[in-house]
């Protein structure tokens, strides 16, 4: 039974009866549960039409309503507050979670295909923490959209045709790869050294341009030769390292789409021709697309006069392919790509396609300062994770919960993944963030360890409990801590729905912390195993069991596992 929707429907009927008009009604939640579970201010909105004081309207409405699942309705200073029957509500909530188990929070299947592109870092060095923000938000959003019923395909767009990759291919001829290092790190070292070489020898720049041109010509002609093999090997070598990092963080892509595919298939040439026929292309030192009809002053560079394509044209071809194979597309991009993303979208619109949705994220840094791949000064995601694991292992040893170094390693890895992923995803993407260790590995207030520890506590309580009797569950006067946690647990499906709808995984992250904190208050104030009243004890065990399920299901939406012991 959806009590909230029942209240809204009843209020809408009441308003129509009073005024003859429809009214959009939204319920608020009072700050404390003793003030009610839901509240509405409709009396203030009705005052003008009914020519009565809000206080009187609220009292009249409160006295006239009877709603299934609502124990009492109070009018307070013009507001109408609704109090649920927690005995019935708790039984229903616990029963639903217990029955659905790992499926609790998942919504009905929709007949809609989504292509979600995230990460898509250039294969010229290891992921830095800016890429980390992209991949964590992207993977969390994927999981939330799947739980919300969408058919989701995640894609990684591989830039194998840009200047950066030509520098890597050129550098591989000049410098030896360090095979003792992780592949993407070895490639990164070559990239940095090659950039230094180019800075000192400007005449070598022409060789980079020749590599780019010759690779594109080979791709366009459908030729496989020594050069295409060099590009393919360099990219795949980097991707091997990337996939290791992604796997460590529980991130998986369904498809790696290479930029060159669209040149080989002839689609890039087709896109250029279609755009030429729009009458919106102007020629100066290059071909540019005039998007002023869409309020964009800057022109989009489409191709060089010699006909060779640019990243933008290949990106448009990629987006057309996406749009032809899904109901909607979502891209994760850094805020510095805003103008480019708008230009690509308006080009799609010009050609008659839907625009892609874009989730932009702001810069992320460590307190030590910023990052730069080109100069080689940056913090890689691998280093960030290893540091998190080292700090987590130290904490696990201090707490004495593991029996062996192997177990310490296993627990520390899960804590580290949680610390990195959760600390990134809890912050709204549009806000710049500083990754702080005292927050990421906080066991007391805001870090993922708070949530994982609440789960470990649930596991410990249930360790020796064989079964929980359903007889007379919640047939007593529940206290505020019990009511609060049960109400929180019931919200997961709506949280998933909302987070998917607005594409904001931080909603899920904030919710799961609320659940953990709500459970900790319940644990501190409500004896479970030591409770003498069997009805109360079984009811509280049911709360512990369903809290464990909700914590597992919710952290799974964020790609985070439970250590079990902490």
Curated annotation (Swiss-Prot):
Organism: Methanococcus maripaludis (strain DSM 14266 / JCM 13030 / NBRC 101832 / S2 / LL)
Reaction equations catalysed: tRNA(Arg) + L-arginine + ATP = L-arginyl-tRNA(Arg) + AMP + diphosphate
Record protein name field: Arginine--tRNA ligase
Annotated compartments: Cytoplasm
Motif placement: 'HIGH' region: 121-131
PANTHER family in the cross-refs: ARGININE--TRNA LIGASE, CYTOPLASMIC, ARGINYL-TRNA SYNTHETASE
Similarity comment: Belongs to the class-I aminoacyl-tRNA synthetase family.
GO cellular component, one term: cytoplasm
Gene behind this protein: argS
First-tier enzyme category under EC: ligase
